[in-house]
Amino acid sequence: MRATQPRGVVAAACLMTLLAVGQPTSAVDDVTLVDAARNQESPRVRALLDQNANANVRSADGSTALLWAAHWNDIAIADSLIRAHADPNIANDFGMTPLSRACTNGSAALVELLLKAGANPNARIATGETPIMTCASSGNVDAMRLLIARGADVNANEPSQNQDALMWAASERHPNVVRMLVEAGANPRAHTKKGFTALHFAAREGDIESVRQLLAAGVDINIKSLPDKAETKQDTNPSASGGRSASGTAAAAAAPRGPGYQATISEGSTPLLVATMRGHVPLALFLLEQGADPNVIDAGLTPLHWASGTWEGGVANPVYGFSEPMSGIPNRQQKIALVTSLLAHGANPNARMTKRPPGFQGLGGGYEDAPGATPFLLACAADDVEMMRLLVTAGADPTLVTETKTTAVMAASGLNRLIGESPITEAQALAAVTFLIELGADAKGATTIGENALFGAAYRGWNTLLELLIEKGADVNAVSKANITPWLAASGYGDRLGGVLYNKEGAEILLRHGADPKLGKPCQAQVRCK
């Protein structure tokens, strides 16, 4: 749904209020009229009106009989009330009007009846939402047409996030409403306070048809979600962006792909980034064919990073327009198809992550060492040999490391990935490390905090992998800045929660290969290690 949901919240609140109408405060026959409408008693409503009951009487919360008729989409009762001079513009104490309720229900017939009775097509409810915004969300084209004909402002927005009818139509996958609004003069480039446009909302839902309508209306396929008062920070140096402009028109596929080849640096997500993050592969493929820039970077990642890695977490930052959990692209064929297409359209396999995305607990099952990581390194962290092979074939450099000097072998061995429940098996890790060694990757070396590949295997009890890494030269006596050695990690004295508490076999393997048990300082993960 939308980044904020004033419409849904208010609708629910009003329903609860309507269902809890208080005791009569005026003449019995008048308030009985509200009760009759609330209970959908049409004959009783007519009888009370025949007895000259006040058609505009309000209950304790300000609700009228007409508001209840609109709530139940009861055309007959609404017609009887209007004939008795019920005012269609009376709102209850929460600002809810009959027209707003009719739009919530998507009832063109009731919308028409209320408009003919003089309902204000631009009346706002308490949140600032207008009828056309509500109707755009419910998706009734006929109701929309009636509102537009009566002068509804197609560019009205609510004050909380500056969301408008076009955005709501796109977020609910109503391409026909999107087209109608654009034809009626809605601004397709309008954005929320967080920078999301209708195109971003359509991309977030994977709605190809709404995306088509918005692109046809002239929206830039690479439009960025720039928050209010934010300035774009974009590196326009062709060598830094791989020869691809922000509009994605240059042929970046032929650009050099070494460590210096960087993604287009900018603030703000593009529709392609949003679609890829949400796992909407058909839409992402469509956007690439339409010229979307595959190398734009936001929140530290490019589309290729999102597509290549395994994601287990959730983004709660409202700049993305959502707060639901995310799990990447579960369909394997679609995942490979998207990565293949990104590479074919010039995505840089050596692009470096600039930061860890906010709110995430996982890059490949909890991978912690994001800054500097390439798509290839993320595939290594997930022990995804098929993806690793695909990226290497496209020019990925397996020797690139993160800012903390984590190598591909370390990532594949489980280093810097949260320990605990994980779908990754030792067999997968062995296959990934073996593939890397065949590529000539070095199993030696340590990160800036002194850990090497042995730490990941020791913590997890991946002892066959442990022996392979030792055979390839990994130092069994490496000491981290926390004074932990691989032997201490295997013996249950490491500084990681959730690891194998005592990997006896691993500890013995390390001792046989020369590990010094006197090195380092035993630590319990629950206590800060010094």
Where are these regions (language model features)?
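N-terminal segments that cap or nucleate solenoid repeat domains
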Residues: S26-W68
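Ankyrin repeat structural motif
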Residues: S42-L49, D74-I82, S107-L115, N140-I148, ...
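Bacterial N-terminal signal peptides
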Residues: A11-A20
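Ankyrin repeat A-helix N-terminal signature
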Residues: D35-N39, W68-D74, R101-S107, T134-N140, ...
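Start-of-repeat signature of ankyrin repeats
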Residues: D29, G62, G95, G128, ...
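Ankyrin repeat boundary/linker residues
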Residues: S59, N92, I125, E158-S160, ...
